[in-house]
């Protein structure tokens, strides 16, 4: 009976030690692993990355995130599960609202920016419903407001947003060379 009590506690402890976020770059794809699921993007679907900026009077405010522009949204949406789409909608809402606030200084925000619709039809005519449609609408609004489809918050990265964006673009330009350079920098003789 006592050992039956310790096993669930031990399993709970092990689960709590799992990483909450992880990004994996291979020669063929970018994978975002989250405690609640994962999404992947083939190299061919990655357009570019950068730091999203929003106009703030005469200046620009950089979001504390890396923006990713996708080549084919339908290809991306087919790879994401509703569970992680819903979690990302919630977790990234504060970043999205920072963008919306800068575009709605007079208080006249379009209602679709504040609440994502549960229906979405892509440019290819593919219809989505539920959480995937809500996520697709968020992607559409992000692209309209920042030029990027996805956000990778600084909290999920292992380096600064500028370094990570540079790394993603280097990976886009030549994934084989980028992966080799990362492996070489991790070898013992190349460490400081």
Regions picked out by a protein language model, each given a short descriptive name:
Residues 22-25, 63-67, 149-155:
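Ordered hydrophobic segments in well-structured contexts
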Residues 82-192:
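Terminal and domain-flanking low-complexity segments
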Residues 1-3, 127:
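Hydrophobic alpha-helical transmembrane segments
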Residues 1, 69-71, 153, 157:
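N-terminal membrane-targeting/pre-transmembrane regions
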Residues 22, 57-60, 141-142:
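A general structural signal for short secondary-structure junctions and capping/turn motifs
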């Amino acid at each position: 009976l006592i050992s039956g009590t310790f096993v669930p506690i031990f399993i709970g402890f092990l689960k709590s030690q799992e990483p909450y976020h992880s990004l994996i770059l291979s020669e063929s794809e970018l994978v975002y692993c989250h405690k609640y699921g994962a999404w992947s993007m083939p190299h061919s679907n990655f357009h570019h990355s950068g730091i999203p900026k929003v106009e703030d009077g005469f200046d620009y405010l950089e979001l504390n995130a890396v923006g990713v522009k996708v080549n084919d949204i339908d290809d991306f949406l087919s790879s994401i599960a509703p569970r992680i789409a819903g979690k990302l909608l919630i977790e990234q809402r504060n970043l999205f609202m920072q963008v919306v606030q800068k575009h709605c200084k007079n208080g006249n925000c379009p209602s679709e920016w504040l609440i994502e619709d549960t229906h979405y039809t892509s440019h290819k005519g593919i219809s989505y419903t539920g959480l995937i449609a809500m996520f697709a609408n968020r992607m559409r609004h992000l692209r309209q407001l920042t030029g990027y489809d996805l956000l990778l918050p600084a909290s999920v990265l292992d380096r600064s947003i500028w370094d990570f964006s540079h790394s993603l673009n280097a990976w886009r330009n030549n994934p084989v060379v980028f992966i080799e350079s990362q492996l070489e920098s991790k070898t013992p003789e190349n460490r400081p």
